[in-house]
Amino acid sequence: MTAVRDPFFPADQSIRASHNPIEVRELGMMDYQRAWDLQAELNKQRQHDEINDVILVLEHPSIYTAGKRTQPSDRPQNGLPVIDVDRGGRITWHGPGQLVMYPIIKLAEPIDVVDYVRRVEEALIHVIRTHGIPNAGRIDGRSGVWVPGKTPEEHRKVAALGIRIAGGVTMHGLALNCDNTVEFYDYIVPCGISDAGVTTMSQEVGNDVTTQSMTAPLLAALDDAFAGRLVVADHSFASAPDPTKIPRRP
């Protein structure tokens, strides 16, 4: 699913149904359940054209969220709460120092979920590369943005994606590790991937990269990617099995 392929839309065409500006809501630190409820409400409003497209910008208190393909063996044993959510993928961690964005975007017809995901990844790759990690890219077979290591086991994930489309409108989104701890990843199998690591912008560039410093550049890159001004390219440096290709939990 991560390999670049011809999208339904030309690469330089907007994937959004609307040409109105995207509204941005910076929410600060917000409880995950509260943010999820807000997403669901905004998603329904966007389906009925009661609001314009919007991107929620926030951080979460420390918590695990489990996507539809999470396995029992993925789950933590450290006592932190786990919320089962309706996005794709498996389990991940959210917490302070991690920049989270939830685009609520009505997609143009015909809906191309893969193209949408690739555009979000392209925005992340552009910003990560221009802020000190020039070799960041994709691993074919796995979503998100990665920093290559000398061996496959040393590849490190710096940004994660989890997407849902409801009524033609996107939910959930992306998480960019800025200056958060990676301790809590040790208690899970993050995104179902046991043969690679997790990193942060700060660890890779050697100085403090805050969520605040990354917010404006990432919002601009997302806007460009959705509009077709930032064109999806093949930034793959490796391939690996897709851990999500297992049955969904009930």
Swiss-Prot record:
Keyword Cytoplasm tagged: yes
Gene3D superfamilies hit by this protein: Bira Bifunctional Protein, Domain 2 (3.30.930.10)
Pfam families linked to this entry: LplA-B_cat
Start and end residues of each BPL/LPL catalytic domain: 49-230
E.C. no: 2.3.1.181
Keyword Acyltransferase (UniProt): yes
Enzyme class, spelled out: transferase
Function according to Swiss-Prot or TrEMBL: Catalyzes the transfer of endogenously produced octanoic acid from octanoyl-acyl-carrier-protein onto the lipoyl domains of lipoate-dependent enzymes. Lipoyl-ACP can also act as a substrate although octanoyl-ACP is likely to be the physiological substrate.
Miscellaneous information on this protein: In the reaction, the free carboxyl group of octanoic acid is attached via an amide linkage to the epsilon-amino group of a specific lysine residue of lipoyl domains of lipoate-dependent enzymes.
Protein name according to UniProt: Octanoyltransferase
Organism for this UniProt entry: Corynebacterium diphtheriae (strain ATCC 700971 / NCTC 13129 / Biotype gravis)
Lineage: Bacteria, Bacillati, Actinomycetota, Actinomycetes, Mycobacteriales
Gene this chain is encoded by: lipB
